[in-house]
Amino acid sequence: MKMSRLVAFSSSLLLGAVLALTGAATANAASSVQAVDYVALGDSYSSGVGSGSYDSASGDCKRSTKAYPNLWANANSPASFAFTACSGARTDDVTAGQLSPLNSSTDLVSISIGGNDAGFADVMTTCVLQSESTCLSRIATARSYVDTTLPGKLNSVYTAIRSRAPAARVVVLGYPRFYKLGGSCIAGLSETERSAINSASDYLNAATAKRAADHGFTFSDVAGRFTGHEICSGSAWLHSVNWLSIGESYHPTAAGQSGGYLPAFSSAA
């Protein structure tokens, strides 16, 4: 009986110690997250266009409360959070108008950029409204830009970020493939056009990932997380063309932000 009580007592002490250590580890992990100073930069895929619930104070930048930067900040309670991503932004816009919150204390930065520089909005407009041959020609022009001009643009903005935030972890997020090939769409673009658009997105992501790596940044690919949720999938996390709100066309829905972009960022942050 005495031995049983001793074993039970020892076990309770051990359990208490384990729980105390676990609690301490959890508290330390929470406090480390709370110490983060986070700045969210980029274009409409980071501002949250397409997910609704836009902050009226953000005006045409259309920063959504359902965008992944806000979702991450709400879940992790960083010490400070600055959200300057803006719809329509190009690399030069980031350099000129989004970097002021960055400083030597900044711990974490997120950014999606390059799609507008490469003219992907015009690509989609061309492909929707014009012939297949014109669509494919416009895609080829965008790919040429990604080859010849975009790398220098990305270098400039990445260098500016690192200069202002020398100690920050910088996570560069890519773009999803738009279409599920052989999917549920029975009208609209041809399979050839859809395949070429997907390939162009992959091409842009590869170029962006290379520039990010060259600067010591982390590239987080979202394409895999959108697999099964492309346009024509029957469970899309992306808007197709929306004639009533054209700016939301080909942007992630709220589900795309929470189910695609948020975990892609969280896993790399």
Segment roles from a protein language model:
Residues 1-30:
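Secretory targeting and sorting signals
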Residues 25-39, 93-111, 154-168, 265-269:
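Short amphipathic alpha-helices and their capping/turn segments at secondary-structure boundaries
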Residues 30-85:
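Serine-esterase "nucleophile elbow" of acetyl-processing enzymes
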Residues 37-42, 46-48, 80-85, 107-112, ...:
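Structural recognition of the beta-strand scaffold that forms the well-ordered cores
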Residues 49, 93-146:
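Oxyanion-hole/transition-state-stabilizing segment in secreted/luminal serine hydrolases
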Residues 51-54, 121-133, 184-187, 231-241:
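Short, flexible, mixed-charge acidic loops at enzyme active sites
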Residues 71-80, 152-169, 203-220:
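A structural motif corresponding to the C-terminal end of an alpha-helix
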Residues 176-269:
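Catalytic His-Asp segment of secreted/periplasmic serine-dependent ester chemistry enzymes
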